[in-house]
Amino acid sequence: MSVRTKICGISTPETLLAAVKNGASHIGFVFFEKSPRAVQPEMASMLINRIPDHIDKIGVLVDPDDNLLERVVHAGLTGFQLHGHETPERVAFIRRTFPKVKIWKALPITRSQDLDQTLHYRGLVDRVLYDARTDGALPGGMGKRFDWRLLKDYNHPMAWALSGGLDADNIAQAVAITGAELVDVSSGVETAPGIKDMDKIAQFLQAVRLL
């Protein structure tokens, strides 16, 4: 199985280079001020200019207003990852307004019934991202994971990706259980919240290549 990887929360040239040279298929930038990984669109633009065209540039946004969406599109993003409480109606508006941008919707998962949320976004988004539900102000990047067995044999109605508590040590098990073909890692390649580690990025991507 060929598994692709999104390294999320990149904020420096050094960690960006580690992700690119070790084979990341997607690079994620966080535009949420409460996150320790937050970057301004202007900084993201400088980093995006260093990324080869074949790698997707995804912006993580939490209930963004139209002005922020315009700014991050101008920075060069190819996709939005909506990680807040965006309703299907709001997502439909974003889709109409930015027809060339790929849209992901992050869905917090605790139990099997949570997977039904996917149906509300069918036809509106290009991909859903299954992530662990968090208790705090941050919707993701907390190192928490959900029960991967919930995805075993699940009939996915659209393209999807797996996130939540992934690292180099558990990625093989996560993919074996879920069948994920795209995985998303953030805290699992950090030494502290928001501090990406080049060696951990390389180790994670090497572990994915060995699957």
From Swiss-Prot:
Keywords, alphabetical: Amino-acid biosynthesis, Aromatic amino acid biosynthesis, Isomerase, Tryptophan biosynthesis
InterPro entries: Aldolase_TIM, PRAI_dom, RibuloseP-bd_barrel, TrpF_fam
Reactions mediated catalytically: N-(5-phospho-beta-D-ribosyl)anthranilate = 1-(2-carboxyphenylamino)-1-deoxy-D-ribulose 5-phosphate
Enzyme nomenclature, EC number: 5.3.1.24
EC class of the enzyme, as a word: isomerase
Swiss-Prot/TrEMBL GO biological process terms: L-tryptophan biosynthetic process
Pathway: Amino-acid biosynthesis; L-tryptophan biosynthesis; L-tryptophan from chorismate: step 3/5
A single MF term (Gene Ontology): phosphoribosylanthranilate isomerase activity
Coiled coil residues, start to end: none
Family label: Belongs to the TrpF family.
HAMAP family: PRAI
Protein name: N-(5'-phosphoribosyl)anthranilate isomerase
